[in-house]
Amino acid sequence: MKKATFRKIIWANLILAVLILPKIIFYPYSLAPAELAKAMLLYDQLQPLDDTFVTIMLLLILIGYLVSLFLLYRFNDYGRQLYLVVNFIALFTYFSQGYVVFDSLEYVLDGISTIFIGFIIAIIYFSNLSKEFKKKK
């Protein structure tokens, strides 16, 4: 794989994340059926506010994700390690959340995002570009 292609994949992953965040934050159940959306909004209102630890972890994951993408774009070995750690921590923080309901658009975007994450991990560890990360600059 060429470096330019890998960099385009990094950009596509970043653009997808920028598209997903506003959808999840501001329009969480916009495409869900009316009864389900109403029930989930009521469920969300009954839940206590996220504790400080979870909020800090989510912010650290977001910052770590952006930094790791930048370092991967520059073919830095620390970016490769950080990307793996951030995605591993994000996986476990998803389990700390209660019920999660996806509408069809969120489901598709999350699936594409997961494919990108797996594809990037495969490229940075198992392709011929993995040697580029090990070079000292």
Positions of predicted regions on the chain:
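Topology signature of small-to-medium multi-pass alpha-helical membrane proteins
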Residues: 1-137
